[in-house]
Swiss-Prot record:
Catalytic activity annotation: phosphonoacetaldehyde + H2O = acetaldehyde + phosphate + H(+)
Name listed for the protein in its UniProt record: Phosphonoacetaldehyde hydrolase
Classification via PANTHER family: PHOSPHOGLYCOLATE PHOSPHATASE (PTHR43434), PHOSPHONOACETALDEHYDE HYDROLASE (PTHR43434:SF19)
Quaternary assembly: Homodimer.
Keyword Hydrolase annotated: yes
Catalytic residue positions: D12 (nucleophile), K54 (schiff-base intermediate with substrate)
Cofactor note: Binds 1 Mg(2+) ion per subunit.
Pfam families the UniProt entry points to: Hydrolase
Cofactor requirements of the protein: Mg(2+)
Organism listed in the record: Vibrio parahaemolyticus serotype O3:K6 (strain RIMD 2210633)
Function summary: Involved in phosphonate degradation.
SUPFAM superfamilies: HAD-like
Length: 271
């Protein structure tokens, strides 16, 4: 076991470690709006606020101008908290039923994580999923070989979830990390990158495996370089405001970033 200056890497779940393209939550948001109110949203609208907790996500979808316009046309008002509660109530059982189908780790994720563990680096994690969904996902992911040292769900903490730093900092506390600048936050969405910045960590955004590119694994594998570059540009645009320290395609590219951060820490740099 080598002695890395990095104490912990904190991963998001869907689109980062499991569920290439982050399709489990996206398709179910579409279904929940339909089931709750017979109201149609498309996949792009469902993806727009990804990374937030799921109640906040539903609220944010309702605030998208085009969605708000259609909602007003159908119901004569903007979406209320009671409406959000009803959609969330439809979302939860759908998500619990489907999340295990999207629990397979992204290519090389388990190998990369195990390589970090071999260096003595602790593995934290946090998710926009609520705890009752995580309770379904965690054991299935473990069967595939992914076992982080700690997991925080978006509704675990009274302070709330992203983009605030609380979930990341809960990992710091539970993993006995002594210095936030010795931590790396890896995520496929802007709110998760803001979370890492707000917690004082190095941040790594994923361009192609997650929500922002919205590719299936099959599309990713079949794509030519021009198609991938177009997807990268689409994702980069979503990450501009959150300004991650690093942008890479997928978790497969993380080891080189870890080496670079180790060198920067050894030279006295901070995030």
């Amino acid at each position: 076991m080598s002695n890395s200056p990095i104490q912990a890497v904190i991963f998001d779940w869907a689109g980062t470690i499991v569920d290439f393209g982050s399709f489990a939550p996206t398709s179910i948001f579409v279904e929940a709006f339909k089931q709750g109110f017979d109201f149609d949203i498309d996949l792009e609208e469902a993806r727009e606020p990804m990374g937030l907790g799921k109640w906040d996500h539903i609220q944010a979808v309702g605030r998208i101008p085009a969605v708000d316009k259609r909602w007003n046309e159908k119901f004569g008002r903007s979406m209320t908290n009671e409406d959000i509660d009803a959609i969330y109530a439809a979302f939860m059982p759908l998500q619990k039923a489907k999340v295990a189908d999207h629990a397979e780790p992204i290519l090389n994720a388990v190998e990369v994580v195990n390589g970090l563990k071999d260096k003595g680096i602790k593995i934290g994690s946090c998710s926009g999923y609520p705890r009752e969904v995580m309770d379904v996902l965690i054991p299935v992911a473990a069967d595939y070989g992914y076992q982080p040292d700690y997991v925080v769900a978006t509704d675990d903490l009274p302070q709330g979830g992203r983009p605030a730093p609380f979930m990341a900092l809960k990992n710091v506390i539970e993993l006995d990390v002594t210095d936030v600048k010795a931590c790396v936050k890896v995520d496929d969405s802007a709110p998760g990158i803001f979370e890492g910045h707000n917690a004082g960590m190095w941040t790594v955004g994923l361009l192609l495996s997650g929500n922002e590119a919205g590719l299936t694994f099959e599309e990713y594998q079949a794509a030519d370089e021009a198609t991938l570059e177009k997807a990268r540009e689409k994702a980069r645009a979503k990450f501009i405001k959150s300004a991650p320290h690093y942008l890479i395609d997928t978790i497969s590219d993380l080891p080189e970033v870890i080496v670079d951060i180790e060198q920067r820490l050894a030279a006295g740099e901070r995030p």
